[in-house]
Amino acid sequence: KAEKILLNRPAITGSSVIHQKAKVCSGSQINDTVLGRYSYIGHDCFTCQVQIGAFCSIADNCRIGGHKHAMERVSTSPVFEAGKNCLKTHFASHPRPQVPLTVIGNDVWIGAGVQIQSGITVGSGAVIGMGSIVTHNIPPYEIWAGNPAHFIRKRFDYETILFLQETQFWDWDD
């Protein structure tokens, strides 16, 4: 009897919560992440300690959040930290640096290959262009792109942005 082999399916670990009306595509590693309704994470993405709102589109090959290394120590190697590490060796047991929460608002579009540093907040309605490296918070309804990512323009005029923020359509019932 042949067994069905699932190749490259997503790995969803830790305290992750994926809304029943959300999708995570194959090859993605989702760690301690909350994914809101009608949002999707594309193929081969990585998230760690991330909160993602509703109606978000995250393209393939994105990296959002993740662990930090303590650069003020003699070594940045995890063998000098407490807890499990990929090297399975310990020379010291300093506490691990906290992983700050990365927040992606509602109705955010993140292009392919984007990397977002831990602890960043991306406001609702924002767009991040393909291949961007995000090291600063992005306000609502702004378009950013580049390495490092920089402001390109607002998506709408001030009145439209205010209207969309007030309606909070992402909280409406289906």
Predicted regions and their residues:
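Conserved catalytic segment of ABC-fold P-loop ATPases
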Residues: 123-126, 139-141
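Short, intrinsically disordered, charge-balanced linker/junction segments flanking boundaries
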Residues: 1, 167-174
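Flexible, glycine/small-residue-enriched loop-and-beta-strand segment within the central core
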Residues: 3-8, 15-19, 23-120, 147
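Short, charge-rich, low-complexity interaction segments located
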Residues: 147-156, 161
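Conserved catalytic-core motifs of eukaryotic protein kinase domains, centered on the activation segment
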Residues: 68-70, 138, 154-155
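Conserved G/P- and acidic residue-centered "switch" motifs that form tight phosphate/ATP-binding loops
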Residues: 128, 146
